[in-house]
């Protein structure tokens, strides 16, 4: 316990990346299996409880925020997003990098199920991001670089009729969050000769590159049609 608490102290007060997190990063596939298995167990438990109760009808007010279908879809979206976030097409030296549209699965969930569920799943995505390693400088930096940056993805849920605007909003707000953290706490790493504001804007443009990739994908006609069809089918359980 003392060793564990020491590692937690290192993470949250010294800003270091202890060996514990290196081990987690190296065993991401095992972690993914555990996450999916845990989500599957929860799903099975919910199904069994519903069958045991044998409730023929649940009133609108009594409906849980997550039913079996939405919970299963959330687990799938988180699993896919988690795997994609490990694949760095470009890995930047001071943190961050270009991934193959790792935010898109979470954006899709928020788009289909709305902001309440969207923000909850986005927050879960933030928690999963911590498994990849945390650079903690102070509470404000941690908030903008991690908590807000990933939880804000759920804002796509406010654009139930416009996936494009939801995608753009989620990426731009995450981009802005990283830029604020970079300018406030990391501009000292700027050794490029350009001004600090431009440096922070350019460095964090990896989020904008992913945004463009997401836009291209969701505007492909077959993909767009499949998403809308999936939305109609999944939303049946919410009505």
Where are these regions (language model features)?
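Loop-helix junctions at membrane interfaces
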Residues: 1-239
């Amino acid at each position: 316990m003392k060793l564990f608490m020491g590692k937690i102290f290192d993470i949250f007060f010294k800003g270091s990346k202890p060996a514990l997190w290196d081990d987690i990063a190296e065993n991401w596939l095992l972690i993914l299996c555990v996450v999916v298995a845990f989500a599957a167990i929860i799903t099975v438990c919910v199904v069994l409880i519903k069958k045991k109760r044998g409730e023929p009808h649940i009133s609108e007010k009594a409906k849980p925020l997550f039913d079996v279908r939405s919970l299963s879809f959330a687990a799938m979206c988180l699993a896919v997003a988690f795997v994609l976030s490990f694949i760095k097409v470009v890995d930047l030296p001071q943190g961050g990098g270009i991934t193959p549209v790792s935010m898109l699965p979470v954006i899709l969930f928020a788009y289909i199920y709305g902001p309440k569920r969207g923000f909850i799943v986005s927050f879960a995505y933030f928690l999963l991001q911590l498994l990849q390693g945390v650079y903690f400088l102070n509470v404000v930096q941690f908030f903008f670089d991690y908590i807000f940056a990933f939880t804000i993805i759920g804002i796509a849920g406010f654009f139930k009729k416009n996936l494009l605007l939801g995608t753009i909003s989620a990426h731009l707000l995450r981009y802005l969050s990283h830029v604020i953290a970079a300018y406030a706490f990391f501009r000292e790493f700027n050794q490029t000769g350009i001004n600090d504001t431009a440096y922070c804007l350019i460095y964090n443009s990896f989020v904008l590159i992913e945004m463009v990739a997401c836009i291209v994908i969701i505007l492909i006609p077959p993909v767009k049609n499949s998403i809308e069809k999936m939305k109609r089918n999944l939303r049946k359980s919410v009505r």
